[in-house]
């Protein structure tokens, strides 16, 4: 298949057994498909088209799906397409994605492309792209290749601890996507990830020290875009999991999931306002692996993990638990004003890294533009598929 080819997805709608929610499977379980990384902008402004990845004919490419008809246009071709990296610019004009070490901008109308940045020789680019709200700038992490751990074959978690302990030389790069210029913001011997430019303000970059929770010094870090003001946002003892931090849409606070592995085993959503830099407990929650915020800021959504064992420590040698037990693998909606959690539907993901990428079975839920649906990924019915639940 090639760029601009069209595939036709067959939708299947059902009522969730546990909540009665209407859920529509958007792709078919005979091949792997998933949406982009959960905080990427992957829908057009009118909410009618969805950017996702599908593995067909042995390779993963990006597709743009009409969520009313299921028709999807192939947007990329060739090897090395980073299947979680794509995003649509706020003005709906361009698709931004990474292919190998090249960062591409594709005109959605004409299909014309240009490379606006390429990682230098000897370095490798990470998968996460952190755009500014106006999509003029982007932050990424680059790692010097000769400092990383020797990764084992397969899209599993074997190298997660090894790469953390190797303390690779990483740097945060700030890119002007319009001018094609760049500068290095920060560099250190530590595995860095998840750079996110502060919404609205655009003055800071949130990033993490990546690796198992009991091996890193602290996960949450922030730095000004001029490279000054490096700040650890929160101390992190070795028995505490802090995960999947995000900016609130107004850029005023950083939010994240806090989970104790000893003592009271407390789990809740917490925030750090930039005005005070003092942590606030927002509300207790189910054991979310990831959570996201609606564009309006009125709702949150989380994918609960029924296993007590952290994802990277699961036994990934088998496909799924076959006991028939229904664990707390549900999608939850949070009413921000009421601080109330509501069970939306069962995602039933196996959480297993067996399809080629360790992220493939992660639900990674996010809201559609009008907040009337939540889209997520699960391998509930076969290989990972895209699902859309009515809120």
Residues covered by each model-derived region:
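Asp-box/WD-like beta-propeller blade repeats and closely related beta-sheet repeat scaffolds
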Residues: 80-170, 184-187
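Short, conserved, GDST-rich strand-edge loop motifs in beta-rich repeat architectures
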Residues: 4-6, 140-167, 208-217, 259-263, ...
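Blade-level signature of beta-propeller repeat domains, shared across WD40, Kelch, NHL, RCC1
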Residues: 361-391
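Blade-loop segments of beta-propeller domains
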Residues: 32, 36-39, 57-100
């Amino acid at each position: 298949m090639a760029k601009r080819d069209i595939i036709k997805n067959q939708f299947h709608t059902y009522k969730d057994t546990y909540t009665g929610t209407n859920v529509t499977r958007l792709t078919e379980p005979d091949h792997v498909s998933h949406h982009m990384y959960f905080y990427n902008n992957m829908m057009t402004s009118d909410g009618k088209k969805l950017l996702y990845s599908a593995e067909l004919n042995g390779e993963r490419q990006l597709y743009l799906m009409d969520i009313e008809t299921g028709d999807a246009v192939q947007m990329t071709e060739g090897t090395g397409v980073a299947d979680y990296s794509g995003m649509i610019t706020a003005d709906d004009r361009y698709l931004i994605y990474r292919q190998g070490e090249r960062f591409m901008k594709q005109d959605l109308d004409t299909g014309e492309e240009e490379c606006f940045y390429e990682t230098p020789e000897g370095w490798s680019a990470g998968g996460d792209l952190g755009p500014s709200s106006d999509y003029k700038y982007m932050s990424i992490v680059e790692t010097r290749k000769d400092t990383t751990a020797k990764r084992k074959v397969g899209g599993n978690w074997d190298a997660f601890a090894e790469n953390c302990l190797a303390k690779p030389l990483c740097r945060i790069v700030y890119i002007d996507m319009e001018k094609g210029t760049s500068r290095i913001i920060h560099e250190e011997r530590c595995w860095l990830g998840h750079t996110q430019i502060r919404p609205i303000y655009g003055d800071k970059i949130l990033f993490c020290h990546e690796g198992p929770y009991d091996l890193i010094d602290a996960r949450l870090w922030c730095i000004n875009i001029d490279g000054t003001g490096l700040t650890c946002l929160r101390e992190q003892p070795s028995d505490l999991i802090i995960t999947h931090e995000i900016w609130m849409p107004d850029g005023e606070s950083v939010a994240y999931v806090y989970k104790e592995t000893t003592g009271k085993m407390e789990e809740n959503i917490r925030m750090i306002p930039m005005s005070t830099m003092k942590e606030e407990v927002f509300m207790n929650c189910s054991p979310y692996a990831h959570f996201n915020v609606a564009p309006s800021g009125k709702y949150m959504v989380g994918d609960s993990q029924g296993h007590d064992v952290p994802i990277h420590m699961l036994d990934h040698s088998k496909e799924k638990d076959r006991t028939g037990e229904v664990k707390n693998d549900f999608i939850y909606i949070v009413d921000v004003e009421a601080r109330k959690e509501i069970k939306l539907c069962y995602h039933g993901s196996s959480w297993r890294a067996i399809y080629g990428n360790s992220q493939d079975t992660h639900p990674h839920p996010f809201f559609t533009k009008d907040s009337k649906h939540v889209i997520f990924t699960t391998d509930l019915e076969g290989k990972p598929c895209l699902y859309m639940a009515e809120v």
